[in-house]
Amino acid sequence: MTQTLSQLENSGAFIERHIGPDAAQQQEMLNAVGAQSLNALTGQIVPKDIQLATPPQVGAPATEYAALAELKAIASRNKRFTSYIGMGYTAVQLPPVILRNMLENPGWYTAYTPYQPEVSQGRLEALLNFQQVTLDLTGLDMASASLLDEATAAAEAMAMAKRVSKLKNSNRFFVASDVHPQTLDVVRTRAETFGFEVIVDDAQKVLDHQDVFGVLLQQVGTTGEIHDYTALISELKSRKIVVSVAADIMALVLLTAPGKQGADIVFGSAQRFGVPMGYGGPHAAFFAAKDEYKRSMPGRIIGVSKDAAGNTALRMAMQTREQHIRREKANSNICTSQVLLANIASLYAVYHGPVGLKRIANRIHRLTDILAAGLQQKGLKLRHAHYFDTLCVEVADKAGVLARAEAAEINLRSDILNAVGITLDETTTRENVMQLFSVLLGDNHGLEIDTLDKDVAHDSRSIQPAMLRDDEILTHPVFNRYHSETEMMRYMHSLERKDLALNQAMIPLGSCTMKLNSAAEMIPITWPEFAELHPFCPPEQAEGYQQMIAQLADWLVKLTGYDAVCMQPNSGAQGEYAGLLAIRHYHESRNEGHRDICLIPASAHGTNPASAHMAGMQVVVVACDKNGNIDLTDLRAKAEQAGDNLSCIMVTYPSTHGVYEETIREVCEVVHQFGGQVYLDGANMNAQVGITSPGFIGADVSHLNLHKTFCIPHGGGGPGMGPIGVKAHLAPFVPGHSVVQIEGMLTRQGAVSAAPFGSASILPISWMYIRMMGAEGLKKASQVAILNANYIASRLQDAFPVLYTGRDGRVAHECILDIRPLKEETSISELDIAKRLIDYGFHAPTMSFPVAGTLMVEPTESESKVELDRFIDAMLAIRAEIDQVKAGVWPLEDNPLVNAPHIQSELVAEWAHPYSREVAVFPAGVADKYWPTVKRLDDVYGDRNLFCSCVPISEYQ
C-alpha cells in the first residue's frame, strides 16, 4: 500500500464530484484543442499580466461530510427564540409536501428563467397561479410574477408612479409614517438617485402637502393598525395622485382588497405563504396594478398565449419592457426575481385553498383577539383598536417585560416608544399566548384561553366592518382541487415533468453559468437553525449567521482581490445598483458630485445601462472593434470628452463576447487617469476564480452573482444574490441598514434591500461550495470551464463559426456561434435551431445576445465530456438538417427546424410533413427522451391578446 493516510482521507473528493470530466476525459479534450495541460491552456488564453502568481488563500478542500459537520456546528450558535417582532416577517409552516417535492427537488430549483417557454410550462403555470393569487387578494387587474422583496417593491412602486403620473412637473413622493422602517429606508435610497423629495408624515396629513405625484400607504401599519383609506384614496385620485398601498398577504385573506378601494398599485411580501424567514430572505414580493399601467410595470409578467397548433400555452409577456432589450430605458433593472419562492407561495395557496387560507387567517386573528382581550382585562392599554395580527401594547416597565421575554426565549418588538409590539402568525398556539400573558402580566395572571375565546368569538370589533372582505377569493379550480397530499404531490410532479432542468440535461446558456448545485450545498438551507431566524433578532441570537457570513465574506475578499464585501444586494442587478451608488457617493464625498457619466461598452448586458440609469447616471456607449474588444481609441475619446464629469466605466471580464481582452488593464488605467472608477461586472467570474481577480486587474468594485459562480441555484428565475466587493476607498459607501447595525461596516448609506444581509438563508450554499472545493478546486473549476468551452468551440467551428476568439484562436468560458451566414443562405434562424434543440433534449443556448443572430454557449465545468459530446452531436445533426433544407430535400416552410419543437401527440396525429415522425420526435434516439408539452409559442398573439390570469382548467387537459 503506497498511499498515505492523507491521500486515503481524500479531503478533495468533492472536487471530482463537482467537476464533470474526469482526468481521462480532460486529457482527451486537451488533446482535441491542442493543449498539454490545464495550466498550459490557461497560460495560452489568459493575458500574462493578470495571471495570479499564487492562488487565493481560502484553505484546503473538505469532504461533503466534514463541511456539513463544520457548518452544522456554526449554525448551532444561532439561538431559535420565538419571534413576535413582525415588521413584515413571520414564522411559517411550510407544508412538507411542498418542502420535499419543490424546495428540495432539483427539477424545480435547477431550472432557468423561462425565456424558452416550450420547456418551462410547469413553472409558468405555477407563476400564473401566483399572479392569480395576487389579483384576487389585491383586487387589481394586472400582476407580475414576483419582485425581490417588499421594500424594493415599494421603490419600484414609487418609480412606476412617476412614470404613469400626469403631474409631470412634480418630484415629491409622500410616504405614510407607519410603513415598515426598512421600506422607507429603501424608498429613500432610490428617491435620492431619481431626484425625488420624500415626504414622511401621518397619512391623514397627506393633503397638507402640495405638488405630490404619488403616495405610499400601508393598509396594516407597521405597529399593527388597520387603516380604512377608502375616502382618502378617493380624494387623492381626484387630485390625479398615484396611490400605492403596501399590504400583508395573509391579512388580505380577510381584509378588503386595496384595489377595490381605488388603489393604483398594491404590493407586499409573499413570505408568510409558506416561505421561512431565513434571517431576511429570500422571499418573493407580489406586485399588482391597474390594467392601464401594465406597460409601465416592473418585473416579469406571465401571459396566456397559443402555440403553433393553436393550443393554450404560457409565456413571459411584454418582454420588450425588460432591461435586456430596453437597456437604460427599461422600467427597472430587475433581472433575477424570486421564482422559486413565488412558486412556493403559489403552491401554498393551491394546497390550502380559499377555505384553508381563511381558516389560517381567522385562527391568527382569533388568537390575537384573545391576547388583546386578556391584556386589556388586566389593565394594559392597546395603542390601536383595529388590528389583524399585531398588537402595540403600552407597558410601564418595558425593561422588565423585555427581560422576562428574553428569559422565556421570546423576541418582542422593542423599538416603539413606551410600548412593545407583538405579531402572531400561523405557528402561534394557545400555549404561546399563555406564555405571552406570563411575560406581560406575570405568572399569576389567572387568564384562560377558552373563556377569553367565548368572549371574543361573539364580540370581536378589531376589524372595522367596512374593512372586512365581502367577495370570494381563489375561485379558480386549481385552488379548490389539490388538498389531499396525494393529489398535491401528483399536481406538482405534473408541473415538474413539463420543464427541462439540470436534472435532465445540460443548460448551455451563455452568461448564465448553469453549473451543479450539489445536494450537500443545498441541505443546510432547510436547517431550522438557518431557516427560522428573524432578520431583526438581537445579534447575539445570530452568532452562527454572523460567523458564516464573515467567513464567506473573507473568502470572497481573497478570491476577488478587493478589501471588503457587502452582502446586502439580493440579486445581480441590485449588486450593480449598490456598486454604482458606492461610486456616486464616493465622488460626492470628494465634492465631485457632478461626475455622472457612465461609460458602457456596446457589448454589455442590458442590466448595466438600466442600473446606471437607476443610479442617476448618464450612459455613454463605447464602441467595440471588429474582434469584439473595447475600442481603446474610442474609450480614450469618450473619457476625455467626459472629462471631470466621468464617473465610471462598467465592463465585464472576460468580455460578454467570450474572450479575455488583452487590454483590460489599460482600460482601467484610462478611466482612472480621468478620475473615474472601474465597475467590473461579476457575471463572468467563473472564468476568473483562482486564475485572476477583479482587484488584481485594477477594478474598484464588482458584484458577484452567487447564483452563477458560487452555486446558488437559479430556481427557475430566482433567487439570486449579488454581494459587492469593493476597494478600501469605496467601503464607507456600501449600503447600510436603518434597523440593524451591520457589524464591521462603517457605512452611513441607505439600504438597497429589505434585510441587512439580503437573502441570507441561501448564503450557506456558497459557503459550502468554497469550503468543499478549497483553493485548489476553485481554480480547477475555472480551468475546466475554459476547457469545456474551447472543446465545444473547436468541434463546432467548422459547422457554426465562432464569432469572437482571443489569442491563439481561443475563447474564455463561453463561445458565440455565428448563425448569420446560414440564416442568409437558408433563412433558418437561431430561433429555429434553439427550438430544434428541444427535440434533441436540450435547453437552447442564449439567443441573439450579445449579438443578434447568434447563439452563446457556456457549458460550465460541471458537464462531463459525455454530455458535451451529446450536445455537440445534436448541433452537428442540426447542421446536417440545415444542409438538407439548403439542398432542397426539405422545403423551407416545412422541415424539422421550422416546425420544432415536436410534441408527443404528433406521433399519432395525421402526418403530412416531408420528413418522418421518427426524424421529428426521436432525432437523438428513444432513450431518455424529453417531451415538450407545447409547440412553438406565438409571441405576437400573446402580446396582442394579453391575458395574465388563470384560464379554465380544461385548457390544460
Curated annotation (Swiss-Prot):
GO molecular function: glycine binding; glycine dehydrogenase (decarboxylating) activity; pyridoxal phosphate binding
Cofactor(s), names only, from the UniProt record: pyridoxal 5'-phosphate
InterPro entries attached to this UniProt entry: GcvP (IPR003437), GDC-P_C (IPR049316), GDC-P_N (IPR049315), GDC_P (IPR020581), PyrdxlP-dep_Trfase (IPR015424), PyrdxlP-dep_Trfase_major (IPR015421), PyrdxlP-dep_Trfase_small (IPR015422)
Domain of life assignment: Bacteria
Keywords carried by this UniProt record: Oxidoreductase, Pyridoxal phosphate
Enzymatic class: oxidoreductase
Annotated positions of the N6-(pyridoxal phosphate)lysine modification: 708
UniProt keyword Oxidoreductase present: yes
Record EC number: 1.4.4.2
Oxidoreductase found in the keyword field: yes
GO biological process: glycine decarboxylation via glycine cleavage system
Substrates-to-products reaction catalysed: N(6)-[(R)-lipoyl]-L-lysyl-[glycine-cleavage complex H protein] + glycine + H(+) = N(6)-[(R)-S(8)-aminomethyldihydrolipoyl]-L-lysyl-[glycine-cleavage complex H protein] + CO2
UniProt protein name: Glycine dehydrogenase (decarboxylating)
Protein source organism: Shigella boydii serotype 18 (strain CDC 3083-94 / BS512)
Upper classification of the organism: Bacteria, Pseudomonadati, Pseudomonadota, Gammaproteobacteria, Enterobacterales
Gene: gcvP
